[in-house]
Each structure stands twice: as C-alpha cells, then as structure tokens.
Amino acid sequence: MTRLAVPKTYKLYIGGKFPRSESGRVYEIVDSQGGFLANAAKASRKDARDAVVAARAATGAWAGATGYNRGQVLYRIAELLEGRRSQFVEELRESEGLSEPVAQRQVDAAIDVWVWYAGWADKYVQVAGNGNPVSGPYFNISTPEATGVVAIIAPQESSLLGLVSVIAPALVSGNTVVVVASERAPLAAISLSEVLATSDVPGGVINVLTGSAAEIAPWLASHADVNALDLAGAGPELGRPSDCRRRDAQARASARERRACTIRRADHVLHGDEDGVAHEGHHLKSGVGREPRTGACCQRTGHLGWCNGTSGDGRRSICASGARRR
C-alpha cells in the first residue's frame, strides 16, 4: 500500500502562534519553473492589526531585557537554524531556483547574521551612546533606546537572507517586529517562524505575515501603534520611495493630531486648564526626570515630554510622540 505524503500548511506567525488568515484567504506559491509548491495564507487587515497588538504587548519585556540576554536569544536562533540547514537549502532551491552551492551560501550567511548581531547586543550601547559636553553643573549622556514596534517590508528577491538582514538589526536594540515576508517566495520565512517558535524568542517579538505587500503595507503605515517603518522590500507596486514616505508622513500626522487631542483632554482633567496647556509647576506622573531649564530641550517620557522652552506668557507646553529637541 502506497503511503500518502502529508502536505505542509504554511500559516501566519502572530504572537508566538500559527493562525490561519482571519479572512480564510490563501494564494499559490510556485517554484522557479512555475510549478505548484504550496498554499500560503494571505494576511488581511485584521491579521495586520493582530500582529501589531501582539508586538506592542511584547515590547516592554523585550526592551527591558538586558543586552546580554537578547544576545543569548539571537544566538539560540542561529543554533536552531544551523540544525535545519538542509531544509532551508532545499526550500531556497525550490522557491527561488538557486543552485545548491548558492543556496548553501545564503543559508550560511543568514546564520552568520544572527551570530553577528548576537555579539552586538550587549556592545552597541557603548558604541552608540556617549557623554556630551555641556556648560553647566550637570552631566548630559546620550544612550540609545528601543523605538518600539517596527513594521518591515522584507526584500522580495532574497527570501531568507534578506529577511534575516532586516529583522536582526531591529531586534538587537529591543524593538519588536511585524514583517511582511517575500510575497513570491515566503516558504523560508514561515520555516524560520517555526525556528523562532521553538527558540527562546518570546511570543509577539517577531510576527510574520505573508501575502501582498502592496495590500498590507498601507495598513501598517497608517497604524497609530507602529513606531517605525523599514521599506527595504518596497517595490513598484508600493509606488516610489518618496510616495511611501509621503503616505507615511500623512498617517503619522493624523496619528499625532489624535494623540495631541488626547493629551490635551488628559491635561484638562488633571490640572483643570481650560485650554489644555500645562502651567509652570505641573508635572505629569509619567515623567522620568527633569532637565535643567536651558532653553528648548525636551525630555523624552514615552509619548509625553516637557518642552522647557517657555512661551510668551510663561507657560510650558507638552510635546507629543516623545520628540527630542536640542
């Protein structure tokens, strides 16, 4: 009796789980010769929102972990990827039509990227941070911090090495990621998700969506809870890079306007100001410290900050979106 093979189902990876698309949609993945390989889930707007929610929920713990701990997690990914090297080589050969030596070099390079950034996890702060010379009786120190949720459009041609090369730099500093994998060849990305699920990466730190980048990218760009965009894999279907930046700027402006209105309403409740502007002497509980009053210098406190520059009537306004002014 002939045994039937068990076909693999390629799903999304959201919050450490493998759900099907909320819409129930799938699309066909073909090999370099046009032959059928598999069906992959086609992410919807709801899936993109769920991925952002999962990434935001994981931000605190991942950003709060020590650099040494994050380095250990990234190195563990490299270990597991090394153990499944032959599987990834075969998937790259089938989906991208690469020769055996080229596929092997790409998988080896992807493993090396994880090892490289694992080593940087507890060192980049010393390189990027510094003490700044100031004319005053205090210290001024710059230190890098996590941005938050980063939405990434992965390169379309290099489905594994390109994907790893955009994910690892975002993770090393404590960001969480929502990545749209290569639409044409997403098999390696979903197999990488299986590696992540069995590694020490907390659920929600990396979320992988498959489907149309042109369809998903605008939803991510306009999401108020996405802090940064990486358009490494943006192609003609998304328009020119300048068009992408313009749409992103419009979405950010709308989000800032909504956030500023929320801040004014909250300040009105806290301090009783009719115009929603904080007066001298009022300090929000979310503040993390004070800076010397030396003109326009904004202390980042999450989404709120104090602008120490005063207006003509002696009032100080609230900065939204954690702006930094020097």
Predicted features and spans:
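N-terminal Rossmann-like NAD(P)+-binding subdomain of aldehyde/semialdehyde dehydrogenases
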Residues: 1-136, 290-295, 304-309, 313-316, ...
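Conserved small-residue-rich beta-alpha loop and adjacent elements
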Residues: 119-202, 299, 326
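Short acidic active-site motifs
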Residues: 138, 215-216
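Generic beta-strand/beta-sheet core signal
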Residues: 153, 173-176, 180-182, 209-211, ...
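Nucleotide-activated donor-binding/catalytic signature segment of Leloir-type glycosyltransferases, i.e.
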Residues: 205-206
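Hydrophobic/aromatic ligand-binding patch that stacks against planar heteroaromatic rings
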Residues: 168-171, 219, 244
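C-terminal segments
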Residues: 2, 112-127, 141, 230-326
